[in-house]
């Protein structure tokens, strides 16, 4: 908890110190009010007192002083509220930025470690918990103990019976706080975990809504959601019911304490006997008035003590969630990406346009099975290298190692003759263009998606965008869109078909004119006609680009200069289409399951 507050800036710390000063000032002003109440009570009990003696437009009148103190206390509270809100907003805004930038630097391994729903909860709900505890902490949590302790010191030297009544009330409140600490705090710690689970189920159901409907699985998903929702609801109900005791118990304690103070005060006043000597009657009456005045003041101070403890109970409502939230946020901020980049590339390219794997192996964790084993090949500039194999054979994992979504656990991967680990982030991703299996578009328009990642040094004008769209076979449908390049793109490109999104993603990579293009099964959503035309265009117009293609269709890779056949993470065949068709059983099995013998023999 305290670790995360080390991220506070000097300005924010100074605002916190200033807020605490104003909290102390507010407590002081509030605790002065009972003194003026005592003066007013004494004046009201004195014969010949006029209204002007109690309230007048000068600072000598106790009523005016009481009014000024109340107004000053109100202004101090306003200042504390402003400083608390400003500090909390500033701190959490920066914290969100830090988490967002940290997550952007994560490799796929860290993303999977936390899960997307959990990262979303940490960035939103957890930070909101911290913002709330910081805001309330400066206004309430800080004020509570200061007020309680200060009020007790003000009345500690008064009548012992009154002090005993106050201590009994404090003991009851302490028992309530202990109950909340033991019973509620463990439940508070569960809230974020249960919220993560609910978010995960909701996100899963919404993203897969078509599949859910297609398989009539609504009741199954509803049951999953119902369980997650019920778990969270039951947890929150337990916390809510426990804190529901707070108001009636505190009301009973306050009322009981007030009653006890007045009951004790009545007996103390009654114990002051009126003497028979007329000259001493005035003194005895004055003693009774002083006792009555002390009783009123003590009652006010006692309520301040109770109020202080009530404020401290707020800690037990906010702090457990905030502690858990801070731990979860620190977990993200302290996690270093398994893929780190140097600030600047340490070597200059030696063999432009080449990609080389030298005895590369990869596993997702030290305890998991190898996904790739001893893969070696070299792609020369302008070559087309294809990867084919059964599902789970490691094709996508292999090409994902090139842009360093993961790092190889063994062996070396070179791009342009340089180990990929020696490139800085920007340089490597300027060399390599990547089109993923699932085309990803961002909300905005077509132009904003196409120019994504380009710098001012190499801007993309409309002519270059149209050129890339034409090459990717996307020009026709973009021209038919209202606004054309300015046509709206909804979140995740939901207003485009799968094939259209695929072509836009391909065009986005082509527009940057990288040295190396990676197609991670990027033709799967295209019809055969578009697929064939696109491959033909790529072959003719990107001869200087090295192309690495992961594919399921034999027809997509028949013209490749080199084909690697993968099976359970191992290269079991390497060569051209004709070579593999002649001597590789795995390739033959895949090929003959898709095309006829005549179609295959017409390949390269």
Question: Where are the predicted features?
Answer:
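An intracellular "coupling" helix at the cytosolic face of ABC transporter transmembrane type-1 domains
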Residues: 10, 108-109, 125-134, 138, ...
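A short amphipathic helical element positioned immediately N-terminal to and/or at the very start
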Residues: 1-11, 119
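Conserved catalytic Walker-motif region of ABC-type ATPase nucleotide-binding domains
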Residues: 103, 225, 329, 357-359
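Transmembrane helix-loop-helix hairpins at lipid-water interfaces of multipass membrane proteins
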Residues: 10, 14-79, 83, 156-163, ...
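ABC-type nucleotide-binding domain
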Residues: 348-604
